[in-house]
């Protein structure tokens, strides 16, 4: 746990299918009621933070790909939310899952059912982005949610891993991506400029990214924070809490690690930079 910066919410990533049926599991492996996971969630809540259950991610099978009906899918999502004691649900949809129109539609139907039963449920979508904005598949997902009367509180864009041709400043890319996505959200949801900013969140991959030549620095984090405050966005976040520390050998790295940033820093420095 990283208490630096006093985060208001932790995204718990990820709940996915166990691979073949409609059973939600942490990382596709651990039962949603796993005692060790429950203990960690309790510790996060005791710090004063809320928790948001994030479904999907880059690996494994998202539940909409393995559940046979909207009602069963809604039940699976609800079970995971109940296990975590959460009223915040995020759907991190990327890769092949984003292009699967059948699962996109089923997910929208299930979320709508879930919101009918849970009036306090706040829903966000986490989607990949480029400096030019959201791609056609992401727009189609948001339109599906709209068509099924899903109340979308926030669209969280992943300002990271743009590709080998993007070798410029990562802070600048984050801002450019946000500006483009803002205009798209205003169009899809019929929002005012202010409303579109309030419905947008930014998540950056701190330190060394998965793509060569992409490194998000502490200065970039401060730049994103300042921009977010100016525009009034919903939140800024990072991938991930476990990475917000210097690697053991203290040196910079050319490869992204799961447990450290790959840049020189003090523990929790990125959280503090985002918090201001």
Over which residues does each language-model region extend?
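Conserved active-site loop/cleft motifs that coordinate metal ions or position small ligands
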Residues: 201-204, 235-240
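Short, low-complexity, polybasic intrinsically disordered segments
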Residues: 214-235
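Chitinase-like catalytic core of GlcNAc-active glycosidases
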Residues: 1-191, 195-201, 205-221, 247-273
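A short, acidic, flexible beta-alpha connecting loop/helix-capping segment that sits on the rim
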Residues: 241-245
């Amino acid at each position: 746990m990283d208490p630096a910066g006093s985060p208001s919410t932790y995204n718990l990533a990820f709940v996915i299918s166990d691979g073949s049926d409609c059973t939600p599991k942490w990382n596709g492996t651990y039962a949603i009621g796993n005692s060790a996971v429950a203990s960690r969630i309790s510790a996060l809540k005791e710090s004063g933070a809320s928790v948001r259950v994030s479904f999907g991610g880059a690996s494994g099978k998202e539940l909409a790909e393995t559940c046979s009906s909207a009602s069963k899918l809604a039940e699976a999502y609800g079970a995971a939310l109940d296990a975590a004691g959460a009223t915040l649900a995020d759907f991190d949809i990327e890769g092949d899952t984003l292009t699967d129109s059948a699962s996109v539609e089923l997910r929208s139907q299930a979320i709508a059912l879930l919101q009918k039963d849970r009036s306090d449920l706040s829903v966000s979508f986490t989607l990949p982005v480029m400096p030019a904005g959201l791609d056609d598949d992401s727009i189609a997902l948001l339109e599906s949610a709209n068509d099924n009367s899903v109340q979308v509180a926030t669209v969280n864009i992943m300002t990271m891993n743009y590709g080998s041709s993007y070798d410029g400043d990562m802070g600048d890319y984050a801002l450019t991506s946000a500006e483009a996505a803002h205009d798209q959200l205003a169009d899809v949801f019929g929002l005012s400029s202010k409303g579109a900013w309030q419905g947008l969140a930014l998540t950056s991959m701190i330190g060394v990214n998965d793509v060569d030549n992409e490194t998000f620095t502490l200065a970039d984090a401060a730049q994103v924070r300042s921009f977010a405050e100016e525009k009034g966005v919903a939140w800024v976040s990072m991938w991930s809490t476990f990475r917000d520390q210097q690697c053991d050998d203290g040196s910079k790295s050319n490869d992204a690690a799961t447990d450290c940033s790959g840049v020189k820093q003090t523990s929790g420095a990125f959280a503090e930079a985002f918090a201001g």
